[in-house]
């Protein structure tokens, strides 16, 4: 299974050109849910404003620190990865989906 993680850097728009059927899930970090309408998961930190979060549905779920802290601690905690949401999302994806490949776009921290 391949998982796509989309961040908020300018090249995140490249995700619009990727075929949905390639990915088991599409995980958006923070505002990246606006890049594609077919995202499946949106992960965000505690300080991400509630009015900027998308609405959840049966096929699109929201995930906060209540979930990803447990996942990150499973892999050694924030000491090893820091608070960068690109790394946090990666560890959460690894913990939740156990994918063969994690693909990133828009996470180059420009």
Walk through the language-model features, giving the residues of each.
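Acidic/Gly/His-enriched mid-domain segments of enzyme catalytic cores or analogous surface patches
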Residues: 12, 17-103, 107-109
């Amino acid at each position: 299974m391949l998982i796509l993680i989309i961040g908020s850097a300018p090249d995140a728009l490249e995700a619009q050109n990727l075929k949905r059927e390639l990915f088991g899930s599409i995980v958006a970090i923070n505002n990246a849910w606006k890049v594609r309408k077919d995202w499946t998961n949106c992960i965000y930190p505690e300080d991400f404003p509630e009015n900027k979060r998308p609405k959840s549905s049966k096929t699109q779920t929201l995930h906060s620190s209540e979930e990803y802290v447990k996942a990150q601690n499973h892999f050694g905690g924030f000491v090893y990865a820091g608070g960068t949401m690109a790394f946090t999302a990666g560890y959460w994806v690894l913990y939740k989906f156990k994918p063969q490949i994690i693909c990133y776009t828009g996470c180059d921290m420009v």
